[in-house]
Amino acid sequence: MKNVIIYTDGACRGNPGPGGWGAILLYGDKEKELFGGEPETTNNRMELMAAIVALETLNTPCQVVLTTDSKYVMDGITQWMANWKKRGWKTASKQPVKNVDLWQRLDAAVQRHDIDWQWVKGHSGHPGNERADALANRGIDEMKHKQGQAS
């Protein structure tokens, strides 16, 4: 199995508001940057998208270390998801899981890989996280630029 290091981040200007996600994938001496944006979204959706797209980009099963600054993604994947699935994607209080479309997509994406989930404090100077943050903001900027051209 290939060893891949992934850094992800999401950003939102207003919550909800225009948002972006960014991810960096490192494999040996290879590096891939991914980013995207949506005109109306939330920070949590963008954090999820960063992890989803990064994992979906991997063509073969990999040994992954995925670093996020999102407690929402970290707790969801390591603590909450198993019970959500047992309850038919409902919370402990029997409410539908928020962002269930993305959680289900992430659930599918993680199945192929052996993933070590790592949390890092955001905006604390961690180089991988800072780069992912810059890509997330680029995702917002490029999406807004395209919107400006379309109108």
Swiss-Prot record:
Name of the protein in its database record: Ribonuclease H
Subunit structure as annotated in this protein's UniProt entry: Monomer.
Keyword terms, alphabetized: Cytoplasm, Endonuclease, Hydrolase, Magnesium, Metal-binding, Nuclease
Paired cysteines (S-S): none
GO terms of molecular function: magnesium ion binding; nucleic acid binding; RNA-DNA hybrid ribonuclease activity
Binding site for Mg(2+) 2: D9, D133
Gene Ontology cellular-component annotations: cytoplasm
Family: Belongs to the RNase H family.
Cofactor needs: Mg(2+)
Cited function: Endonuclease that specifically degrades the RNA of RNA-DNA hybrids.
HAMAP family attached to this UniProt entry: RNase_H (MF_00042)
Catalytic activity: Endonucleolytic cleavage to 5'-phosphomonoester
Cofactor note text: Binds 1 Mg(2+) ion per subunit. May bind a second metal ion at a regulatory site, or after substrate binding.
Regions annotated as coiled coil: none
Compartments in which it is found: Cytoplasm
Gene3D superfamilies for the chain: Ribonuclease H-like superfamily/Ribonuclease H (3.30.420.10)
Residues that bind Mg(2+) 1: D9, E47, D69
